[in-house]
UniProtKB/Swiss-Prot annotation:
The keyword Cytoplasm does not apply. This is Uncharacterized protein YncE. SUPFAM superfamilies: C-terminal (heme d1) domain of cytochrome cd1-nitrite reductase. Keywords: Signal. InterPro entries: Haem_d1_sf, Host-pathogen_enzymatic-act, WD40/YVTN_repeat-like_dom_sf, YNCE-like_beta-prop. The gene is yncE.
Amino acid sequence: MHLRHLFSLRLRGSLLLGSLLVASSFSTQAAEEMLRKAVGKGAYEMAYSQQENALWLATSQSRKLDKGGVVYRLDPVTLEVTQAIHNDLKPFGATINNTTQTLWFGNTVNSAVTAIDAKTGEVKGRLVLDDRKRTEEVRPLQPRELVADDATNTVYISGIGKDSVIWVVDGENIKLKTAIQNTGKMSTGLALDSKGKRLYTTNADGELITIDTADNKILSRKKLLDDGKEHFFINISLDTARQRAFITDSKAAEVLVVDTRNGNILAKVAAPESLAVLFNPARNEAYVTHRQAGKVSVIDAKSYKVVKTFDTPTHPNSLALSADGKTLYVSVKQKSTKQQEATQPDDVIRIAL
């Protein structure tokens, strides 16, 4: 065999081996970056506990076959189910008080909230927030978002309807302290600045409402955009250090960044219509789910640009972060309609940031 031919064969072999190693490296990196596991039907919000080293997922299960729902406790690394907490009421919204290690779940269709001991999985109590019977004329308000103030052991819950409220619940006794009235049409978004004693809510009227948690009074309300277009500011997440709010809009292809001191818009980030949003102070980033687009965006909170996009089909829903800000969790729903439920369970995705 000629020396030149032998060299050519060796070169081609080296190039092929190199390309295989590179492809394998990229494949391994992608696998390490994102882990996806099927968990259960009707997946909604999540809560993370560093103390318990666990992630909880609220699932409503089948609309037709299951009367209640299940809260799954997951290993935050492998996403394997380590406990299934069955409930007679369906859980949707979720939060945790990290001081008392109490999980709170909103039972939307029953206008109630359930408290669960994070360590044992035992139900600590339940509170019906709107006991009116549903009729053609009466629509009881429904719990949507929940936030817990660890410092005061208070839970704030947005009760949505044509004219929404925010319920203020005593976490120790699981009793209603008061209801903050007149928070607008479908005031779904809810975020708390515990140190600043401020609670923020957003609604389908296009408003940002600021509440003083010292007396539970509305301090201000501002229509964020006056452009003649329809807006539904569905969720909000805070950067309390820089007094900014990241606000998603399910009706417009942009995420707003707002100065919480005055309601002025700092930036409009181009992105598909959005659902959940979560700010990560450890990385100065915000994460956003785009339900219809089937994607999750990473927004650089310095440049206000989308710097990365994860494909998360079919419908990415809610977000949670590990305590160190190095891991993002996404609940992902399968395609489903009122006529045809999803046949497969919904998923949770773990993303290494």
